[in-house]
Every structure is written in structure tokens, then in C-alpha cells.
UniProtKB/Swiss-Prot annotation:
Domain of life: Eukaryota
Cellular localisation: Plastid, Etioplast membrane; Plastid, Chloroplast outer membrane
Record field: transmembrane: 30-39, 64-73, 89-98, 106-115, 129-138, 146-155, 161-170, 177-185
Source lineage: Eukaryota, Viridiplantae, Streptophyta, Embryophyta, Tracheophyta
GO cellular component: chloroplast outer membrane; etioplast membrane; pore complex
Annotated segments matching region Disordered: 1-22
MF term (GO), any: voltage-gated monoatomic anion channel activity
Role: Voltage-dependent rectifying anion channel that facilitates the translocation between chloroplast and cytoplasm of phosphorylated carbohydrates such as triosephosphate, 3-phosphoglycerate and inorganic phosphate (Pi) depending of ATP to triosephosphate ratio in the plastidial intermembrane space; in high triosephosphate/ATP conditions (e.g. photosynthesis), export of triosphosphate from chloroplast (outward rectifying channels), but in high ATP/triosephosphate conditions (e.g. dark phase), import of phosphosolutes (inward rectifying channels).
Topology of the protein relative to the lipid bilayer: Multi-pass membrane protein
Protein name (record): Outer envelope pore protein 21, chloroplastic
Gene assigned in the entry: OEP21
Source species of the chain: Oryza sativa subsp. indica
Classification via InterPro entries: OEP21
Keyword Ubl conjugation: no
Keywords linked to the UniProt accession: Chloroplast, Ion transport, Membrane, Plastid, Plastid outer membrane, Porin, Transmembrane, Transmembrane beta strand, Transport
Length: 185
């Protein structure tokens, strides 16, 4: 099981305010075929102990295409809602990504294309995201220290973002003032 501590801040919308603070996130990947897995993950708010998110996602990988596709469902808990009300925030998830290696001589520099669609329990689309990222991985920057830099642009929101990952630490920053830090345990 993969476990991480996640801290988010900087949001100005009420929805993002409910997601701020320290959360404990757990993820388990269960292989079901050579190129497919079932991914279950959830998180709890560290201060209240209340669940904030639960999800189950079927993911299929296409190695020859450097692509993957995911389909699943999720529940977002908002402001310590009791369990029956939390089911009102049930959603379906469809996500896809494709990696492009523009320089075959340097496989550590690449372009990622990502898309995600969330739909409510009646299959009405609620959230769409699409992004393009330039990703650069630097192995052994210092002994035992791998670094990954990502510069991305959210196409639908017209907003750039940045990610810096160093071994177990990840820092994300967005131009609208949001940010998050993750530490993989």
C-alpha cells in the first residue's frame, strides 16, 4: 500500500477551503491482468479524522502507445457530511494520458497529454480538465537524489502550473495561488 501525507492551501473558493489542510492518503493497486489493474484510494483529514475522498478506478495500460485509460467512481466528502449525504457527491471518473518522447536520444525529457472527465450520478459532466506537460527527469542529481520537473498548462482553465519532485517529496504550484505538498511514506 502506498501512503502519503498531503497538505493543500491557497484556494479562494469555498469548495477548495474544505479540501485544505493536512490529509492522509492511501492507495492500493491490485493487478488483474498483464496491462490492467484496479486502484483503490482514499484519504482522511488529519485534524478531524473524517474521510474526505474514496475512489475505485479500473486502469488499463497500453505500453506500445505509451498511454493509459482509467474508468471509475469516487465519493467526495464535504464538511464532515454524514455518510448517506456523502453519497450525493458520488461521481464517475474517466481519465486518459499519453506520453510523447520528442527526443528519442533523451527518454528523460518528454511531453505528457492528460485529460479527465467527471460526471455526476446521472452521467451529466461536471468537471473537465485537459493539460499538456513538459516533464524532465534528472537521475542522480546528487548521489541518491532523483529530481523531476514538470511545467504544465491546463488547456480549459488556461492556467500554467509547476511541479518539482525529489524522491519522496512533491511540490505543486498553480498560477491561481493554489499549492500542495506531498510526502510519500
Amino acid at each position: 500500500m502506498e501512503t502519503s501525507l498531503r497538505l493543500r492551501g491557497g484556494g479562494s473558493r469555498p469548495q477548495s477551503k474544505s479540501q485544505e489542510g493536512l490529509r492522509i492518503h492511501a492507495k492500493e493497486k491490485l493487478p488483474i491482468a498483464s496491462n490492467a489493474l484496479l486502484q483503490a484510494h482514499g484519504e482522511i483529514h488529519a485534524a478531524t479524522g473524517a474521510p474526505t475522498y474514496l475512489a475505485l478506478l479500473f486502469r488499463n495500460f497500453y505500453p506500445r502507445l505509451s498511454a493509459n485509460l482509467g474508468l471509475g467512481l469516487a465519493i467526495h466528502f464535504r464538511n464532515n457530511q454524514p455518510l448517506p449525504l456523502a453519497w450525493d457527491n458520488f461521481s464517475y471518473t474517466l481519465r486518459a494520458s499519453k506520453a510523447i518522447i520528442p527526443f528519442p536520444s533523451n527518454a528523460l525529457l518528454g511531453i505528457n497529454l492528460k485529460g479527465r472527465l467527471l460526471a455526476d450520478k446521472y452521467f451529466n459532466p461536471t468537471t473537465r480538465t485537459a493539460a499538456v506537460e513538459l516533464a524532465w527527469t534528472i537521475l542522480d542529481l546528487k548521489r541518491g537524489q532523483d529530481v523531476r520537473l514538470k511545467l504544465g498548462y491546463q488547456l480549459l482553465h488556461k492556467m500554467p502550473y509547476f511541479q518539482l519532485r525529489e524522491n519522496n517529496w512533491t511540490f505543486n504550484a498553480y498560477m491561481d495561488g493554489k499549492w500542495d505538498v506531498r510526502f510519500d511514506l
